[in-house]
Amino acid sequence: MFAIISVTGADHTGIIAAVATKCADLGVNINNVSQTIMDGYFTMILHVSFDDSATDIATIQESMADVEKDQNLVIRIQSQAIFDAMNII
């Protein structure tokens, strides 16, 4: 299954490492990543894939709650199917 993870918060050291480590722990592969810092505000979008027989979006979101709290971030995960459906005419 493919999904999109968005990460936002005040910039500081270790954000990418924390999110990538949690993804690895969950068996989530990072296919592509885009990140930028604007006026001290960090934003990152990750295109990820995972075996949906091993985990699901709700489990990943719940597991990211620790990273959100520890890193003072907002992390959201959504199925890529949502984005695909929005672009079908």
UniProtKB/Swiss-Prot annotation:
Alphabetical list of SUPFAM superfamilies matching this protein: ACT-like
UniProt xrefs under Gene3D superfamilies: 3.30.70.260
InterPro entries: ACT-like_dom_sf, ACT_dom, UPF0237/GcvR_regulator, UPF0237_ACT
CDD domains, per the entry: ACT_1ZPV
Domain ACT: 4-78
Recorded family membership: Belongs to the UPF0237 family.
Protein name stated in the entry: UPF0237 protein DIP1286
Organism in which the protein naturally occurs: Corynebacterium diphtheriae (strain ATCC 700971 / NCTC 13129 / Biotype gravis)
